[in-house]
């Protein structure tokens, strides 16, 4: 099979060639350590601060409020654990949703072991949180609410502005994991009343190894890494300048091209969804029909296993997934799909297709041509035809 089609952009994206070019000088010519006082160090320091400005501009933040990390997992850990530990005298209660990324869920479990109380909010059948449920969950001693902006699994976009307004009114910090939405749809941390926000480079055509945590000025947060005091003392470690420069370039590109990319991907996504539902009996859309990321299509099929579909598609040159690559080694049903009310067998029969800015209509057409026979053959093998 020579044809190779990539429908797994939510797992990771290829690096934009413009990003690669921006990074190159910082491997050999401009290789300094940002903490050094000499020319090479100051050259790197300047690149760092210019990068901070570019990342901040994408979400209407102040440059000083951007803390660079090595991954979204690190940023999410810093947000939850850092805020909880810094504010434990004020209270020991946090609120998260039932559809968070595994690194948020695991951080919350760790905090429970340290004596913190965690409230997990349920979602409706589309994966949406009711902001009023957030209001009800906040109580005396609540220090943080963390709700994912857009689901990495089903693409549903949460009413972040409404949740942020409630948290601000109640005097509680509000964090959102915006890894999937950052660079794809507009975000304004001020209008949305966001206090902390997680973003990742490799989900938006930047390199792996760079991410950020927006921390609004005045938020009390403790570092998890101690050492040289880099990143305003919140993230000690030698700064990975090439990756951060690449991340910043990806942000600048996204700022210019976001609207066009969203429109193009949304059109192809809609064609894909309509084509599947029309051509494959016993197929259904998971998540919200309209209030979802422009590049996400999560579908389920009666009588087949999602992993079997992936293997068969891969043999035909199509790369897809059943969900987060960070937890794909686990055989349990996807927790997000269970949270929206699917039964175990329905969750196991789901397929996530995520498009990117280089996805072509011809690739959608090829997928729609191949899929019906794949599903039919798998159902025949399983005796569900």
Model-based region annotation:
Residues 1-385:
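Pyridoxal 5′-phosphate
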């Amino acid at each position: 099979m020579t044809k190779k089609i990539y429908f797994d952009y939510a797992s990771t994206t290829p690096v934009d060639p413009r990003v690669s070019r921006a990074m190159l000088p910082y491997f050999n010519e401009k290789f300094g350590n940002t903490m050094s006082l000499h020319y090479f160090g100051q050259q790197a320091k300047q690149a760092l601060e210019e990068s901070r400005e570019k990342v901040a501009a994408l979400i209407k933040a102040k440059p000083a409020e951007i803390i660079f990390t090595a991954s979204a997992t690190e940023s999410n850990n810093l947000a939850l654990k850092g805020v909880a530990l810094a504010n434990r005298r004020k209270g020991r209660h946090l609120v998260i949703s039932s559809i968070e990324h595994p690194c948020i869920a695991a951080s919350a479990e760790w905090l429970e072991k340290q004596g913190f109380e965690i409230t997990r909010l349920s979602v409706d059948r589309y994966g949406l949180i009711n902001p009023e449920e957030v209001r009800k969950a906040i109580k005396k001693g609540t220090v943080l609410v963390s709700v994912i902006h857009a689901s990495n699994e089903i693409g549903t976009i949460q009413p972040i502005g409404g949740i942020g307004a409630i948290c601000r009114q109640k005097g509680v910090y509000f964090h959102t994991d915006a890894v999937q939405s950052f660079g794809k749809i507009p975000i304004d941390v001020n209008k949305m009343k966001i206090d902390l926000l997680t973003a990742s480079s490799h989900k938006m055509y930047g390199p792996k190894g760079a991410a950020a945590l927006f921390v609004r000025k005045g938020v009390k947060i403790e570092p998890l890494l101690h050492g040289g005091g880099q990143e305003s003392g919140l993230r000690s470690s030698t700064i990975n300048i090439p990756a951060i420069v690449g991340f910043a370039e990806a942000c600048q590109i996204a700022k210019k091209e976001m609207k066009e990319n969203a429109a193009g991907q949304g059109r192809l996504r809609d064609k894909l969804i309509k084509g599947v539902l029309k051509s494959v009996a016993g197929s259904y859309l998971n998540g919200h029909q309209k209030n979802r990321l422009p590049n996400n299509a999560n579908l389920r099929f009666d009588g087949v296993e999602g992993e079997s579909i992936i293997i068969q598609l891969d043999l035909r040159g199509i790369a897809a997934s059943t969900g987060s690559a960070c937890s794909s080694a686990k055989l349990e049903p996807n927790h997000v799909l269970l949270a929206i009310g699917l039964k175990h067998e329905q969750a196991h029969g789901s397929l996530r297709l995520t498009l990117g800015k280089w996805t072509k209509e011809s690739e959608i057409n090829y997928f729609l041509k191949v899929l019906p026979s794949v599903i039919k053959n798998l159902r025949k093998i399983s005796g569900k035809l």
